[in-house]
């Protein structure tokens, strides 16, 4: 039964990969099965990638995955027991030396650059995932997309949350870190059918230190 379900899922995902779907599908398998890859060309050595190494670059250039349909396919794999727990985050892909890479932006980073500033130059990505278990690190990304130079993390996250919630049968709980504990995110998510839990960091005038509180978005209750 599990094998049949896996085969059904793979066949459905294959249909949503757009152009160059054969090479893209095999590239996906190669990524899953390759423990260490130091370049894209290394993935062409995987036994499941039955093409020559240039096909990897052609697949990435030509493929146009149908993100909405893939998200709907992922949602079908979610448990229907209880309310789904979603987690959103913004991560940086540091590319400070890739001067020819388009759409590089200034991103927050825990590793400082020259001048001891906690930033890097690269690309930012916004992810919203389903967290299915009480313990462990496994999660199912429902949307994972680059934040373009004309967007910001707040706009992207709110849009992604809206897209996910419109396709969920049950009102979810979504959790976010302090980057999203701000008025713009509160306003942009006020009409989304989800209960939002985020941290707010603020300077206490009386204690002179950073404090964290929790806020439930759509009901506007502070805890």
PLM region spans:
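A short, flexible helix-boundary coil/loop motif
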Residues: 1-20, 31, 42, 132-148, ...
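Alpha-helix C-cap/termination motif
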Residues: 34, 46, 80, 167, ...
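Gly/serine-rich nucleotide phosphate-binding loop at the start of the catalytic core
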Residues: 1-61, 65
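Active-site-proximal, Lys/Arg-enriched surface segment
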Residues: 59-135
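An internal, acidic/charged active-site-proximal segment
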Residues: 143-223
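A common structural microfeature
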Residues: 28, 37-40, 53, 82-87, ...
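Electropositive, glycine- and tryptophan-enriched low-complexity nucleic-acid-binding patches
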Residues: 54-58, 110-171
């Amino acid at each position: 039964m599990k094998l049949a379900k896996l085969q059904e899922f793979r066949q459905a995902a294959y249909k949503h990969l757009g152009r160059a779907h054969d090479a893209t599908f095999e590239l996906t398998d190669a990524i899953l099965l390759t423990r260490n890859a130091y370049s894209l060309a290394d993935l062409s050595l995987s036994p499941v990638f039955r093409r020559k190494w240039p096909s990897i670059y052609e697949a990435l250039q030509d493929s146009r995955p149908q993100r909405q349909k893939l998200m709907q396919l992922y949602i079908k794999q979610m448990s229907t027991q209880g309310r789904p727990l979603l987690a959103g985050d913004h991560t940086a892909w540091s590319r400070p030396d890739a001067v020819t890479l388009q759409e590089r932006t200034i991103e927050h980073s825990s590793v400082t650059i020259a001048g001891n500033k906690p930033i890097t130059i690269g690309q930012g990505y916004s992810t919203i995932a389903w967290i299915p278990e009480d313990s462990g690190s496994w999660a199912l990304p429902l949307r994972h997309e680059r934040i373009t130079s004309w967007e910001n993390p707040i706009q992207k996250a709110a849009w992604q949350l809206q897209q996910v919630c419109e396709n969920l049968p049950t009102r979810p709980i979504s959790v976010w870190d302090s980057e999203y504990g701000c008025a713009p995110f509160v306003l942009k998510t006020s009409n989304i059918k989800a209960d939002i839990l985020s941290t707010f960091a603020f300077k206490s005038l009386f204690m002179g230190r950073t404090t964290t509180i929790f806020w439930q978005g759509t009901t506007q209750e502070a805890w």
